[in-house]
């Protein structure tokens, strides 16, 4: 064979190799020989035509997290404490699937942390000091975070914080002797049963590790109490053991719902946040749980997955460790790391960190900061939902939201503080800090005069929306259309649209234009922010003027952008008389007839915050309004309800004042049952449910 032929043959083989699809592989990290044996069994029994499983053994969870972060492994299933740790630097991992402890039809992604004792003992919860204790592992949810947090909260355990001593040292003084796999304090490893280097290791190489191990520690009389989950004690042993309740009573094992330390999030599968293997891991596990024994093993209990799991459920793509665990549990873990000094009085908060959603909002907020004397500080976010997350994580304190986003905020745990009020013909409510009067506005459908579009013939029409999830621009019109058509696929009903927040490749983004002038640092077509020129009320109206056939906005939108009110090039020559409203009965009406021709009367925008910050935020905002509101003493210096360089910045420009919402008002009460129910129904259409809402409502621990 001559050289040329051999070269040609080699090149052909190389091309063939390159053309062949690369084999997909999921590398599972295991922490002991027993887990490795189970993993190898799964390799042999879980056959997937496209994805193969392999096993990577590491001595403990921390090294598994490192291996995944460094791309030497892909996944591991861990408890909430390790979900928290894995979500932090340097790991930056995220949960992608959760264990389900319910059934295939009635899912349950939570479990109960409990304290188990022998019936023959007599001590109460408040008498735990100087008892011998058995724990699942250091930093684990049921076995450490929950019980230690509760002991600190009840002031049974004294700890001056990490500046004085480690939490482990304080706990080692509290209990007489313990087995806490993974601990460094000798007294916390004294009762462990591992041999040589495996003694007290945070893996199944330590016999007393995890739930079954902690219970065995109690069974072997190495401890007086075991901190585990509700399903740890086999039914055959229920007659010999009972639960220790925080109220100093005892109850049978079966009464765990009435006697527990906390209800906590399920174990979850972690992988890298950059999503390079997420789809493969989910696809493999979804098929494997049908064909293989993922949740049991001949080699021991709770190996790789908990035996009590019945399935694995994919998490919403926007889920992260904080959202999965919830603010209360995440903050509780943080408190265990930072400590709370006895008799310490928290420093008084003196400033509200306001979340801004665009460069124009940030500019206005910066001006506000300058003249507020330090009462206002500004944070930056890309969208309303990002602001909600900032507040949940403690990175911001407040933001003003539309009713649709308020619904999401409420489902995520935020509360309404101050509501916008718009009626300039009746300013009586503005004379009081709080009023029984609630601000409202009207959701309307706007069309150009002379066109043939009506509410009755919207099929195939080009539509313009403020953003997905917003009240007037999405929830009301799409909810009404969905109810009328009995079809969740709104995109298939109308023609092309601009609905910021939709998939940029979908019909719902076809009319969007991003930022045509490229004035902003980041121009993202169809982004639910000022990065998209057709975002918001004025943006949806501009979309109608330039591309669409109907715009869904509020009743004042036409007036705010016509007859010389908006100097922007696209709006400066528009006349309000050139537009009409589409009425639900199929007729049309002048834009001035919004009270009789509208899609719905809807709740005002409002300022939201965390429940524990409600009073503080209200005090600051009320004070700022007295200075810079429409009747403020220093309104000539700064106006809270006017915008330069944009529309409706921080607050709607039509706001006359902010009214304090009565304390303990829930988000549902503020929004009203009718609107709340409408949004709840709309969100049953998976195509319309936001990623953040899906994350916040995934489980109820």
UniProtKB/Swiss-Prot annotation:
One CC-aspect GO term: early endosome
Top-level taxon of origin: Eukaryota
Cystine crosslinks: 29-64, 39-55, 134-217, 179-192, 245-259, 355-387, 365-378, 412-696, 430-657, 464-543, 488-685, 498-512, 509-526, 583-597
Region (Connecting region): 338-348
UniProt binding sites for hydrogencarbonate 2: 466, 470, 472-473
Keywords from the named record: Disulfide bond, Ion transport, Iron, Iron transport, Metal-binding, Repeat, Secreted, Signal, Transport
This protein's name: Serotransferrin-B
Annotated positions binding Fe(3+) 2: 402, 441, 537, 605
Binding-site list for hydrogencarbonate 1: 136, 140, 142-143
Keyword hit for S-adenosyl-L-methionine: no
């Amino acid at each position: 064979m001559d050289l040329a032929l051999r070269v040609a043959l080699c090149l052909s083989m190389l091309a063939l190799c390159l053309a062949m699809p690369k084999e997909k592989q999921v590398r599972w990290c295991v922490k002991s020989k027993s887990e490795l044996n189970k993993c190898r069994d799964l390799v042999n029994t879980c056959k997937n035509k496209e994805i193969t499983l392999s096993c990577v053994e590491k001595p403990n969870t921390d090294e598994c997290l490192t291996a995944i972060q460094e791309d030497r492994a892909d996944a591991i299933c861990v408890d909430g404490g390790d979900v928290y740790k894995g979500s932090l630097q340097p790991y930056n991992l995220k949960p992608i699937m959760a264990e389900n402890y319910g059934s295939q039809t009635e899912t349950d992604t939570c479990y109960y942390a409990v304290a188990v004792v022998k019936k023959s003992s007599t001590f109460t919860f408040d008498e735990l000091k100087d008892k011998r204790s058995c724990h699942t592992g250091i930093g684990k949810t049921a076995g450490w975070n929950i019980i230690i947090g509760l002991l600190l909260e009840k002031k049974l355990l004294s700890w001056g914080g990490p500046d004085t001593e480690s939490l482990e040292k304080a706990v080692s003084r509290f209990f007489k002797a313990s087995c806490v796999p993974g601990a460094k304090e000798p007294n916390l490893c004294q009762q462990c049963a591992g041999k040589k280097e495996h003694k007290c290791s945070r893996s199944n190489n330590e016999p007393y590790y995890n739930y079954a191990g902690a219970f065995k520690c109690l069974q072997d009389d190495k401890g007086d109490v075991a901190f585990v989950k509700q399903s740890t004690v086999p039914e055959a042993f229920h007659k010999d053991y009972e639960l220790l309740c925080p109220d100093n009573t005892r109850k049978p094992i079966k009464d765990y719902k009435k006697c527990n330390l906390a209800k906590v999030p399920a174990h979850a599968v972690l992988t890298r946040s950059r999503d390079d293997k997420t789809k493969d891991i989910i696809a493999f596990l979804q098929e494997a749980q049908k064909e293989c024994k993922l949740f049991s093993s001949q080699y021991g209990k709770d190996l790789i997955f908990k035996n009590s799991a019945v399935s694995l459920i994919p998490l919403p793509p926007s889920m992260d460790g904080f959202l999965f665990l919830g603010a209360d549990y995440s903050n509780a873990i943080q408190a265990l790391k930072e400590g709370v000094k006895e008799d310490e009085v928290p420093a008084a908060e003196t400033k509200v960190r306001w979340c801004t959603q665009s460069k124009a909002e940030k500019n206005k907020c910066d001006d506000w900061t300058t003249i507020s004397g330090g009462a206002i500080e500004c944070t930056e976010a890309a969208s309303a939902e990002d602001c909600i997350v900032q507040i949940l994580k403690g990175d911001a304190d407040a933001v003003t939201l539309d009713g649709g986003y308020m619904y999401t905020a409420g489902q995520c745990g935020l509360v309404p503080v101050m509501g916008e009020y718009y009626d300039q013909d009746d300013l009586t409510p503005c004379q009081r800090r709080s009023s029984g009067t609630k601000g409202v506005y009207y959701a309307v459908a706007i069309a150009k005069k002379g066109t043939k579009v009506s509410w009755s013939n919207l099929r195939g029409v080009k539509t313009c929306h403020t953003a997905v999830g917003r009240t007037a621009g999405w929830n009301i019109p799409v909810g009404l259309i969905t109810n009328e058509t009995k079809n969740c696929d709104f995109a298939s009903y109308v023609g092309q649209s601009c609905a910021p927040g939709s998939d940029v490749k979908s019909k719902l983004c076809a009319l969007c234009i991003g930022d045509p002038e490229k004035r902003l640092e980041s121009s993202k077509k169809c982004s639910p922010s000022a990065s998209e020129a057709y975002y918001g009320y004025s943006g949806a109206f501009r979309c109608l003027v330039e591309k669409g056939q109907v715009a869904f906005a509020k009743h004042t939108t036409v007036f705010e952008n016509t007859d010389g009110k908006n100097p922007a090039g696209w709006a400066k020559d528009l006349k309000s008389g050139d537009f009409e409203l589409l009425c639900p009965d199929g007729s049309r009406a002048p834009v001035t007839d919004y009270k009789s021709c509208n899609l719905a009367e809807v709740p005002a925008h409002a300022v939201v915050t965390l429940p524990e910050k409600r009073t503080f935020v209200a005090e600051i905002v009320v004070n700022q309004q007295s200075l810079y509101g429409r009747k403020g003493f220093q309104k000539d210096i700064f106006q809270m309800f006017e915008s330069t360089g944009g529309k409706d910045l921080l607050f709607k420009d039509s706001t006359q004042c902010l009214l304090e919402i009565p304390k303990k008002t829930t988000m549902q009460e503020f929004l009203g049952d009718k609107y709340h129910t409408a949004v709840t129904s709309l969100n049953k259409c998976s195509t319309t449910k936001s990623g953040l809402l899906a994350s916040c409502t995934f489980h109820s621990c």
